[in-house]
Amino acid sequence: ATIVWKMEGGGYADCLMVCTVAAIISYIPIGIISAKIGRKKSILLGIILLGACFGVAGIFNAYHPIMNVFFAIIGFAWASIGVNSLPMVVEMCSAADVGKYTGYYYTFSMSAQVITPILSGFLLENVSYRTLFPYSVAFCVLAFITMSQVKHGDSKPAQKKSMLENFDVED
């Protein structure tokens, strides 16, 4: 941020704060939206938004307040992935295998969180600081391709009720 966007002090932390606050605000609405359109579509939408916003952010040569809009969208997009990923994993397995599949999910998720700073750090040091956003876009493309191949684990929409059943109340 200091080199590419000429930001001084702790101003670059504001970008992460905007993402985080947007994600926190988004968690419950995303859960509601995902129940209507499905987890897979919500995740794919999140990946598309992430990739698009990373691509746009990579174009800027200096920080501009409009970037906060993109960072807010990134927070929303990240939340749409996070809210739906583990439930999809759990939905794909039997009750006896929940622990095993949760272990797989966290092993790969945490491995990515360990490996990407090493890979991106190598690019930042040996190529350019401007590689961070293209690197992110590339992995969004890979995530989209991978997620588009998932066939199970989506939420099952509630069956439409007959007009009479809409007046029924639970005991």
Protein language model regions, located:
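Loop-to-transmembrane helix entry/capping segments in MFS-fold secondary transporters
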Residues: G9-G10, C93-Y105
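Intracellular juxtamembrane helix-capping segments at the cytosolic ends
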Residues: S80-S94
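Helix-to-loop junctions at the C-terminal end of transmembrane segments
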Residues: I25-R39, L124
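Multi-pass alpha-helical transporter architecture, strongest
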Residues: Y135-V169
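Hydrophobic core of transmembrane alpha-helices in multi-pass small-molecule transporters
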Residues: P65-S80
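Short amphipathic helix-loop junctions that connect adjacent transmembrane helices
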Residues: A1-G11
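C-terminal ends and interior cores of transmembrane alpha-helices
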Residues: L49-A62
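A membrane-interface helix-boundary motif in multi-pass transporters
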Residues: F122-C140
